[in-house]
Structure formats: structure tokens, C-alpha cells
């Protein structure tokens, strides 16, 4: 294990030649980052080295464990069988906020959703951006964040509010101008440590390491999905590659919208826009007033969440339940309920 500053060059050399860090060294590196023991040059070099080779699930899990322990949330967490819908972003597809719509739809179908999110990563508008635009208080007190779950079935955790230790790294990450290992860690460090998760990845080569990381972090059920057309959600365009974690084992599969009676559609049909446009799309989807492609994309991804959360054992039934909920506008009531619980803007 790395114990002294003079050992960091040797650790960097391991990464540069393609070696996998031990769990102990990966954890020590994260602890050093959080303690600001590394210079900006050293940190930049490590981030670039991780970018230059495929990161491993064991490395991600070890670093995520450190971040989870460092978060600002007390150990007391609700025992509700939580599920998260946070993904890596980075697909550059500029779709509307699908996973955000899924969070409220899944809640309306009976799941307890702890949505962990941030501002924009892949699109022009991140989950935090669009929810703030619709009146949610992103930095609500802990009692409000937790208190929303029993009544609303959903809560939102704004990542920077619960991971203050990462604030000092933010300027350097931005200055690098490229995505780093921290973009992969974000979906793994939900402060409420949900038992289940649906995690979208923008690149197929991330399916296995992210599934391995979730497995090592002890999740009960999870789905890691890489959508047709390069989407970090299940797509309507064609076959979607998935890794399914269940009973401690990971298996590979494919699923398509057409498997569930949904109409195939190109990515263009799911395009979003600026903040106002994405707010309008999200509101329309949740109220049951959206185009079929928007509705179907949300229903397909919601079915994965309902399976992971144990609400539905059959994906086809999950799609049907989600479609019914969307058509009745039930998810919008969940957003309004959460907005009120987080002491945001009241419905006029």
C-alpha cells in the first residue's frame, strides 16, 4: 500500500504501463486526493493515466468506498429498498432528461427512488439543472431530503451538496477539459447507498467494469445499460446491451424496445434542447402529454428500474405499468410532491 509521498511516482508508473492498481492502492490514491496530499500536476497526471487505459471495476469500487465514507450524510439511512437511476453521461446525444423522468415514473409505480444527480455532463442540461428550473431546492436540508421518500416515493440528492470533499478537485477537473475517472465514480457514490440501480454508460467497454464495481459494492440488483446508437440509456433505436446483476452474479443480455411492443425510433426523436425546452419536455412527459417516442423511452427505462427495485419481476409488465402511469400523469404529482417536500416553489 502507498504510505509516503515518494511512492506516488511508482504508482503512476504502474498505471502508465497498464497495470491494475490493487484495491488498497486505489483507495489510498482517493484518500490522498481528498486530503489534498497530491500536487495539481500529480493529480492531473493520475487522471490522464486513468484516461489512457481501461479502468477496472475493482479500482472503481475501492475508490467509491472511500468517497462514500467521506460524504456528508450520517450513517442513519432509510430502510426502504432504494433504487437509483444515475448514469455516467458523456454520450453527447443531447437527449431530454430521460433518467430524471424515469425516477418520477418509477416512484409513481411503487419504487422508492433516491435520484443522485448533478449539473450537465453529456447534454446541455443535467438533472440538477432541469429540476432546479422546475422549482426543486437542490440544497434542501437533510430532514427534507429523507422526509420526502415516504410520501413522494422519490428524493433528489444534488451530488456537490453531499460530497464536499470533491469541491477542491473541481477546478482542476474542469481545466483538463476531458472526462475523467470521477465521471465514472459519480453514479457509484449515492450518499444513501441504494440496494439497486440502473446505470447507463455511454461506451460499451464500460459495461463490464461498472457492473463489476456495483457487484463489489454489494448491490442486490442492478442493470448496466449501453443503448443503441451510443446512448447512456436504453434506446428505442435498436438492440441495447445490458449487464444484469442478480444474486451476486453478472450476466449479459440484449433487449430492444420492439421486444415489449414499443415502436422503434431514431435518437433524433429523443433530442432535447436548452434548459427551457428540457423543462417543457420533462413536464409534458410526466403529465402524459408527450410524443409517443418520449413516452416509450421513459417506459422502457422505467421497466428496468422496476425490475431492479423488485416491484416487477417481468420487464413486459414493467413497461405496461409505466405506460399506464405516464398516460394518467401520475409521475407529475410525484415531482410536485417532492418539490413541496424540499421546500421549493409551490404549485400555483
From Swiss-Prot:
Entry binding sites for Mg(2+) 1: 99, 233
Record-listed Mg(2+) 2 binding positions: 232-233
Alphabetic keyword roster: Amino-acid biosynthesis, Aromatic amino acid biosynthesis, Glycosyltransferase, Magnesium, Metal-binding, Transferase, Tryptophan biosynthesis
Amino-acid biosynthesis is among the record's keywords: yes
Binding site for anthranilate 2: 173
EC numbers, comma separated: 2.4.2.18
Binding site for 5-phospho-alpha-D-ribose 1-diphosphate: 87, 90-91, 95, 97-100, 115-123, 127
Molecular-function annotations in GO: anthranilate phosphoribosyltransferase activity; magnesium ion binding
Function noted in UniProt: Catalyzes the transfer of the phosphoribosyl group of 5-phosphorylribose-1-pyrophosphate (PRPP) to anthranilate to yield N-(5'-phosphoribosyl)-anthranilate (PRA).
HAMAP family cross-referenced by the UniProt entry: TrpD (MF_00211)
The protein's assembly and partners: Homodimer.
Entry protein name: Anthranilate phosphoribosyltransferase
Species annotation: Synechococcus sp. (strain CC9311)
